[in-house]
Amino acid sequence: MRTGRILAGILISVAAIAAFPLKSEAKLSSKDLYKQFQNPDSRYRPFVRWWWNGDRVEAEELVRELHLLKEAGIGGVEINPISFPGGDDTLATKPLKWLSDEWVDMLKVVFDEASRIGMTCDLIIGSGWPFGAESLSREERAEVLLTYARPVPGGETLDMSLFNIYRTLDPGVTKVNVSRTPHLVSLLLAPDPINDLSQAIDISDKVKDGIIKVDVPEGKWQLYAMVKFESFACVINGAPGAAGSILNHMDALAVRKYLDHMTDTIEAKLGPLSNHLRAFFVDSMELEGCNWTSDFAEEFLKRRGYDVLPWLPFTMFEVERLGDVKNFDYGSRKGDKFKEEVNRVRFDFELTKAELLQERFHRTYLAWCKEKGVKSRAQAYGRGFFPLESSLGLDYPEGESWTTNWLRHKLGEEMGDEDYRRGRGYTMINKYVSSAAHLQGKRVVSCEEMTNTYKVFTTSLEFLKVGSDMAAFSGITHSVWHGFN
C-alpha cells in the first residue's frame, strides 16, 4: 500500500477536518464531506518540521524531498534550519549561512516548488531555540541574575576571591557562551537564621582588586553575592549565522531589530513573504533561565511600587540548566514572617518578568507578523510566560506531544496500561494552548508532534497514531510531525 494512503487513512483526523472548515461547508453533503475525508485538502494534512541540518542544503535535494513528502500525504513543511549532528557524515555538502544570498536562494527554490505542487510553507524565526545570532551586539544579548550563598564562620576574617564566586555561579546552560561576562551586583552578610531584611549587612565596599576581605561578626552568617552574567548562553542547536548569543527577549527594540533584519534580508530578494508563507514560527521558549534586562529594576519599581534589589538575594534559589531549581533551601534559614515576605516579593518578581516578556517579546512578534501579512505560530509557554494569555493572540497557538505513548525514558522502562502518564496526554501545556484557542474562537491548534520517540527510524505508524490521539484528546487539531530531514 502506498505510504500516502496509509498516512491519509491513519493520521488525518476528524479533528483536523473540523479545524480547517471549508468556506462552503454548510452546503456540503455528507457524501462530499466523506470524499474530502478520503482525499483531504493539503491544509487538513499533517505538516512536518523540515530540518535543514547545518544548512547543508542543495536545490535538487530540496525539491526531491518536497515531492517525497507530498507523495507520503504531507500537506506542508516548517522550514527549520538547525545545527548539523555532531560526528555525522556531511556527504561533502557545503554549509550555508543563515540569511546569506545562497541560503535565500534555497528558500526561493522551496517556495516555488511548494507552490507548484500545492504544499504549504511555514518558516522558523532564526534557528534552534531560543533564537539569537553571532551578530548580536552585547546590549542585545540575554542576561541572567544569579545568587551565591555559602556559610561563613563568625568571629573570623573572610578573605576570598570574587573569581571563586563567579566560577561557582557559572551558568549551567545547554550551550556555554565563551563571551559570558560576570558583574557583581551586590554583596551581603546575612545572619543565619534571618528574620528581617534590615539584618543583612552590605559589604560591597569590602572588595578590592577582586578580593573580598571583611571581618565577620560573631555568630552564624551566610555570604550572599548577586551576580549578573551578560551573554550567558548560546542558541541551542543553532545553524551557522544564527548560532551565537541568545537574544534578549525582554528588549522590544532588540526583538524588533532581529525580526526586521530577517525579513528585510529575505524580502530584498524574494519580495513580500506573505506571497510564500502561511506562518512564521517561534520554537520553544526555553530561555535558559534568562531573568534580567537593563531596566528591570526600574520597571519593577514602576509596576510594584518598591525597590526589588535588596530582596533579590533572598528570593532566588540555586539553579541549573534551563533555570531549573537545584536547591530550594538555599542560604540562611528564614523566619516565618520574613519567609512570607520573600515569597510575596518572589511572586512580584515573576509577575514582572512575565509582563515584560509578554509586552516586549510576544506582542512585538504578533504586531510584526500582522505588518508582514503572515500568520503567527508559536509555542508561547515555558518558565516566565503566562501559560494561557500568551497563546491568546496567536493565529496558530502550538502545543507539543513530547514522548512516546508508553516509555518513560528508554526501552525497558515501559509504562503499564494503568499508568496515567502514558502518552503525556495528562500534561497541562496542550490544555492551556487549546483553551486559549477556544476562548478566541480559533479552530487550529497546532502541535509539535511526537518530539521524541526514542526509536529513531523504527517508529511504526500505529505508534504514531496512538501517540497523536493523546494529543487530540488534549485539544490538538493539527499535527506538525517532529520531524523530517
List each model region and its residues.
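Positively charged n-region of N-terminal signal peptides that target proteins for export
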Residues: M1-I6
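Bacterial N-terminal signal peptides
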Residues: A8-A18
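Boundary at the C-terminal end of the N-terminal hydrophobic targeting segment
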Residues: A18-A26
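Mature extracytoplasmic enzyme cores
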Residues: L28-P40, R45-F47, G54-R64, L68-G76, ...
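The substrate-binding groove and active-site-proximal loops of carbohydrate-active enzymes
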Residues: R45-E58, D89-D105, G238-H261, D283, ...
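Alpha-helical scaffolding segments of alpha/beta enzyme cores, especially the outer helices
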Residues: R64, L68, E102-D112, R116, ...
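Beta-sheet entry/capping signal
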Residues: G75-E78, G118-D122, K220-L223, S274-D283, ...
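Hydrophobic targeting/anchoring helices
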Residues: G132-A133, K372-N485
